[in-house]
């Protein structure tokens, strides 16, 4: 009887085989618009620290907090709109900026492909929602059902026919927690940018295929299951 995989990575690769993802991984690798599964992490990209105690990227959207205008600006620039909720003292928010977005290839990809509007979960700035309602940041978070931070909300790239609406109807995917690894974060943004959710709503299948790609690119001694 063959031995069972024991390490987490071997389990993941076994799942990829069991789910028939070898072909999917090859297809994704051959896709001309799919970016590399990883890239250079140096030079590191340190965040800014704002007066309200939040970490911030210098390229975050300079917004007047009218989300309709932010969407239009993102679309005109060929980007996707994402709204990021954070709060002061959030360790996962700090890690997002100091660990994940500090990696050069991740920072570059998100900056080049997304217009990110940062909001404070407890903030008092007035925000105009897509339906024209004007609410404080904290009231908007409550309206949208945002409880944890960091939470990112990705919007569809075309809101034709949805004018005057707000909420989940405008969102591209189900919300996922952002307290995860750099690779998962990167894969999620690629998955959304290229609208791969239109092929398969299951992000995990895409992510597992990308893990397999990364493993295949490692030198042989670094691959899981190698013994001396």
Residue ranges, per PLM feature:
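Short active-site neighborhood of thiol/selenol oxidoreductases, capturing the structured segment around
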Residues: 76-91, 116
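A short beta-strand-turn-helix
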Residues: 62-81, 110
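Non-catalytic, surface beta->alpha helical segment in thiol-disulfide oxidoreductase systems
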Residues: 142-200
């Amino acid at each position: 009887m063959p031995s069972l995989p024991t390490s987490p990575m071997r389990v993941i690769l076994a799942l990829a085989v069991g789910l028939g993802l070898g072909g999917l991984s090859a297809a994704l690798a051959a896709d001309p618009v799919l970016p590399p599964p990883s890239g250079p992490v140096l030079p590191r990209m340190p965040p800014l620290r704002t007066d309200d105690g939040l970490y911030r990227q210098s390229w975050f959207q300079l917004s007047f907090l009218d989300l309709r205008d932010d969407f239009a600006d993102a679309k005109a620039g060929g980007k996707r709109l994402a709204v990021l909720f954070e709060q002061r003292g959030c360790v996962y928010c700090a890690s997002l900026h100091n660990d994940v977005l500090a990696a050069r290839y991740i920072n570059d990809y998100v900056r080049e492909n997304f217009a990110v509007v940062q909001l404070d979960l407890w903030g008092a700035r007035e925000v105009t929602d897509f339906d024209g309602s004007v609410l404080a940041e904290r009231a908007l978070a409550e309206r949208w059902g945002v409880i944890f931070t960091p939470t990112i909300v990705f919007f569809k790239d075309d809101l034709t026919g949805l004018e005057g609406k707000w909420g989940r109807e405008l969102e591209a995917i189900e919300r996922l927690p952002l307290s995860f690894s750099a690779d998962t974060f990167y894969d999620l943004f690629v998955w959304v940018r290229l609208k791969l959710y239109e092929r398969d709503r299951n992000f995990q299948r895409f992510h597992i295929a990308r893990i397999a790609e990364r493993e295949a690119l490692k030198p042989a001694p670094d691959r899981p299951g190698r013994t001396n």
